[in-house]
């Protein structure tokens, strides 16, 4: 198989929100039958056609790094986790629509991943502790995905989605809400699939066509993975 250029996308969020199920769905187009807790980091690869259907179309590997752990972990754990944040080209923040705390904690995940973790360990960030303008100069493409949409009754969905609207205001990304146990939410041609493709296109553009400001500051560039198979890699 010919070597393909690749980009690295972090998948961050609290344990139990469905990150592993999401990554499996994105990379294998299948529902994950028996999801388990991620220890350390699990990496899977998605094949993406950049600018599909245009003269500029080109195939890339999207490395999705599912980072385990809790945002309230001890400093030593967070320090170890930081190694996974090297040379990142994009971030997908994942939260559970049925768990308000998991949505609020994305603010702390963003601070940690963007190397601006100024909040004491174990303290949940509230609006009073958090400065939205910290992200005004962020150049890393971001996407927010809410999971377990199927567990919210139709009559409650508007209320829940309004409650999590601050995520889009804080990070200024597009937002996708879905059920990881139902592939139809990412069916070709759907609005979610279009948003996802647009996000990956932006990540690729930042990495290969806009060379400035396309990686998390404070982390040196590391060697890229060599060409290989689509086999999942696990870091424990």
From Swiss-Prot:
Q: Which gene encodes it?
A: RABL3
What does this protein's UniProt record list under function? Required for KRAS signaling regulation and modulation of cell proliferation. Regulator of KRAS prenylation, and probably prenylation of other small GTPases. Required for lymphocyte development and function. Not required for myeloid cell development.
- An individual GO BP term: B cell differentiation
Asked if Nucleotide-binding is a keyword of the record, the answer is yes
Could you tell me which residues belong to the region Small GTPase-like?
1-236
- Residues annotated as binding GTP are 16-21, 148-150, 179-180
Pfam families in alphabetical order: Roc
What is the name of the protein in this document?
Rab-like protein 3
């Amino acid at each position: 198989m010919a070597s393909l250029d690749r980009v690295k996308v972090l998948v961050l969020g609290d344990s139990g929100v469905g990150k592993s199920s999401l990554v499996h769905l994105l990379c294998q187009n299948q529902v994950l039958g028996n999801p388990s807790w991620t220890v350390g980091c699990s990496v899977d690869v998605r094949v993406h056609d950049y600018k599909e259907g245009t003269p500029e179309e080109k195939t890339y590997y999207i490395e999705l790094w599912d980072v385990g752990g809790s945002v309230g972990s001890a400093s030593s754990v967070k320090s170890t986790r930081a190694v996974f944040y090297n040379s990142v080209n994009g971030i997908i923040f994942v939260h559970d629509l049925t768990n308000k705390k998991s949505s609020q904690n994305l603010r702390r995940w963003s601070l940690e991943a963007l190397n601006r973790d100024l909040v004491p360990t174990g303290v949940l960030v509230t609006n009073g502790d958090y400065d939205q303008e910290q992200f005004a100069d962020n150049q890393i493409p971001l996407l927010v995905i809410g999971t377990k949409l199927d567990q919210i009754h139709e009559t409650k969905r508007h209320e829940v989605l309004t409650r999590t609207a601050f995520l889009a205001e804080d990070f200024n990304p597009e937002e996708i809400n879905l059920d990881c146990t139902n592939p139809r939410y990412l069916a070709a041609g759907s609005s979610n699939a279009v948003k996802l493709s647009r996000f990956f296109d932006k990540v690729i553009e930042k990495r290969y066509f806009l060379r400035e400001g396309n990686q998390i500051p404070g982390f040196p560039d590391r060697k890229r993975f060599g060409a290989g198979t689509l086999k999942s890699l696990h870091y424990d």
